[in-house]
C-alpha cells in the first residue's frame, strides 16, 4: 500500500515539475511539488519495518513541512503574500516540541501530537485563504471542499498516527475500524484530486493571462488606425 501511495505521489510531483518547467513564473506548482516531495519521503520512511528515532524525527518534520508547502502553494495560486511569519514560528515551535519529546522518550501518541497539530495549523491557513476569497469559481469551491475533507482526516487520524510505523498494528486497526478504512480511502483520493484541481487552475490562469495580453496588444495596435 505504501509503495502504491509513493508511486502516485511521485507521479503527481513530476507532473507539477513539468507544469513549472512549461509555464514559467508559476511558483504555485513548485511549492506543490515540494509538498508532494515531503509526502513522498514520508511514505518511504514509513515503509521501514523498524521504528527508529531517526525515522520518527524525519516524519515529525516532513508532515508539517508538507502542509506548509501546500499552504504556500495556495497563497501563490491566489496571488496572496507569503505565509505569515507567526504561523511559521508556531509550526516550527510545535515541530521542535515533538523532537524534544522524542529525545525525552515520551510516548508515541504524546510525541506525535505537536507535529500533527502543526500540520493542521498549516493546512488551516490554506483553507482560510480559499474561504476568504470573495469570487470563488467552481474549482475554488471544489478545492475548498477537498481541503476541508483533508482537515477532517488529519484530526480523525491523530490518535492512530503512531501506528503508521507498525504496519501489522495498522492492518489490525483497519480490519476492526470502518472509519479508519474510509479515512485511508479518502486520503488516497483527496491528495491527487487537490493537485489536479490546482494544476487546472494554474493552466487556466495562464491561458486567461495570455488572452488578456493578446487583447491588450490588439487594442494597442488598432488604436492609431481608428484615430
Task: Please describe what each predicted stretch is.
Residues 1-12:
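Hydrophobic transmembrane alpha-helical segments in integral membrane proteins
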Residues 12-28, 41-174, 181, 188-192, ...:
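Juxtamembrane segments at transmembrane-helix boundaries
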Residues 193-209:
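Transmembrane alpha-helical segments in integral membrane proteins
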Residues 204-222:
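Cytosolic signal-transmission helices at domain junctions
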Residues 225-227:
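Active-site-proximal structural segments of metal-dependent nucleotidyl cyclase/transferase enzymes
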Amino acid at each position: 500500500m505504501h509503495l502504491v501511495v509513493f508511486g502516485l505521489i511521485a507521479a503527481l510531483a513530476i507532473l507539477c515539475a513539468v507544469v513549472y518547467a512549461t509555464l514559467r513564473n508559476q511558483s504555485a506548482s513548485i511549492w506543490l511539488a515540494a509538498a508532494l516531495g515531503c509526502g513522498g519521503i514520508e511514505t518511504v520512511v514509513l515503509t521501514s519495518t523498524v521504528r527508529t528515532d531517526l525515522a520518527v524525527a524525519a516524519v515529525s518534520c516532513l508532515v508539517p513541512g508538507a502542509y506548509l508547502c501546500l499552504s504556500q502553494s495556495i497563497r501563490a495560486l491566489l496571488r496572496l503574500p507569503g505565509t505569515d511569519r507567526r504561523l511559521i514560528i508556531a509550526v516550527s515551535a510545535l515541530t521542535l516540541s515533538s523532537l524534544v519529546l522524542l529525545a525525552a522518550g515520551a510516548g508515541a501518541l504524546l510525541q506525535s501530537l505537536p507535529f500533527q497539530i502543526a500540520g493542521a495549523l498549516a493546512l488551516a491557513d490554506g483553507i482560510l485563504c480559499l474561504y476568504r476569497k470573495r469570487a470563488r469559481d467552481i474549482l475554488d469551491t471544489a478545492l475548498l471542499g477537498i481541503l476541508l475533507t483533508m482537515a477532517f482526516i488529519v484530526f480523525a487520524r491523530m490518535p492512530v498516527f503512531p501506528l503508521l510505523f507498525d504496519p501489522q498494528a495498522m492492518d489490525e486497526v483497519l480490519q476492526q475500524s470502518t472509519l479508519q478504512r474510509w479515512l485511508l480511502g479518502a486520503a488516497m483520493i483527496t491528495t491527487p484530486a487537490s493537485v489536479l484541481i490546482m494544476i487546472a487552475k494554474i493552466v487556466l490562469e495562464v491561458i486567461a493571462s495570455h488572452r488578456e495580453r493578446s487583447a491588450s496588444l490588439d487594442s494597442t495596435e488598432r488604436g492609431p488606425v481608428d484615430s
